[in-house]
Amino acid sequence: MVLMIVSGRSGSGKSVALRALEDMGFYCVDNLPVVLLPELARTLADRQISAAVSIDVRNMPESPEVFEQAMSSLPETFTPQLLFLDADRNTLIRRYSDTRRLHPLSSKNLSLESAIDEESDLLEPLRSRADLIVDTSEMSVHELAEMLRTRLLGKRERELTMVFESFGFKHGIPIDADYVFDVRFLPNPHWDPKLRPMTGLDKPVAAFLDRHTEVHNFIYQTRSYLELWLPMLETNNRSYLTVAIGCTGGKHRSVYIAEQLADYFRSRGKNVQSRHRTLEKRKT
């Protein structure tokens, strides 16, 4: 059974995540004190039910040792997994402005910006040990729920999930990436007027990139690097490996290469997901 701990900065989507987990069959508890986690797990052990618990800055223990002690006191039938949700500072400020809700640290007479920054520092011990970090900055409520359903179902099966995501450097580097590869040095279809409106998912763009030896070399060397270290990553109690491929705009080269890598590892029986940040952003 799984004890899913959901944490993250206020406004990043913890309530949405908890509802998605409830839909998946988890027994969900909102804002349970950390010291009560072992007691909850023991209560549910006989019922053979996985649980999900949200922890925010208000019920964080004063020292990381308290959290570690709670984790070590869990029944052996439960496997703890930590999901950390985050979003960039401007997105969090906008969400608070839209909802007009008070930040949990507002009682300390802090400005919203200062409260967000202090909360980030207080939650760092949880963020640093998270099994999965999800950046919700560009996600709608429905997109976040669907993404969690897709990823967490793979996680519950205790199989490492490889996530290949394309992005554009001009939009920023994804904060959930384990590895980031820069492909801006490769030939750019953008400069061909016929290819410019297309994406790396279109056959003419794929044919353009497929003609270049350096593209093949990059794909081969990148997948070889990942294959070399994948066995160690799989035995390191890791459930996700997020590989981000970036080009200038996130539309052509990064999309094509992310798909090529995803197809390669999928053909070898790995649990693989792919996403394209710039293309998803254009749909909204």
Swiss-Prot record:
Region (RNA-binding): 266-284
Binding site residues for GTP: 56-59
Segments forming a coiled coil: none
Binding sites annotated in the UniProt record for ATP: 8-15
Pfam families in alphabetical order: PapZ_C (PF22740), RapZ-like_N (PF03668)
Record-level Gene Ontology MF annotations: ATP binding; GTP binding; RNA binding
UniProt keyword terms in alphabetical order: ATP-binding, GTP-binding, Nucleotide-binding, RNA-binding
Superkingdom in the source lineage: Bacteria
InterPro entries for this protein: P-loop_NTPase, RapZ-like, RapZ-like_N, RapZ_C
Role noted for this protein: Modulates the synthesis of GlmS, by affecting the processing and stability of the regulatory small RNA GlmZ. When glucosamine-6-phosphate (GlcN6P) concentrations are high in the cell, RapZ binds GlmZ and targets it to cleavage by RNase E. Consequently, GlmZ is inactivated and unable to activate GlmS synthesis. Under low GlcN6P concentrations, RapZ is sequestered and inactivated by an other regulatory small RNA, GlmY, preventing GlmZ degradation and leading to synthesis of GlmS.
Family named by the database record: Belongs to the RapZ-like family. RapZ subfamily.
HAMAP family, sorted: RapZ_like
Summary of subunit composition and partner proteins: Homotrimer.
Record-given protein name: RNase adapter protein RapZ
Encoding gene, per UniProt annotation: rapZ
